[in-house]
From Swiss-Prot:
GO cellular component, one term: ribonucleoprotein complex
Subunit structure: Part of the 50S ribosomal subunit. Contacts protein L20.
Protein name: Large ribosomal subunit protein bL21
PANTHER family: 50S RIBOSOMAL PROTEIN L21, LARGE RIBOSOMAL SUBUNIT PROTEIN BL21M
A matching Pfam family: Ribosomal_L21p
Gene that specifies this protein: rplU
Amino acid sequence: MSNYAIIKTGGKQVKVEEGSVIYVEKLNVEAGQTVTFDEVIFVGGETTKVGAPLVEGATVVGEVEKHGKQKKVVTFQYKPKKHSHRKQGHRQPYTKVVIKSVNA
């Protein structure tokens, strides 16, 4: 059984294991560089470690593959009988990360 971990990044919790690909909120790291996640909440596998609130000494190392934007989300608001409407679009930026190792 391979090691897996639950990390905190971008205000969200993500389950990761070696070789997995995750999409997280945009990180200020160039594509091709490595990124280390220090906020590890849980480590599982042959042994289990639960953080209170974080697991001491545990890190997750990944490599940034690319940056991009998600599909556009369109919001449309209108007021009936008032000839008033508003259309707004939003594309959330993300970072694609390939997990290289889970160190507990």
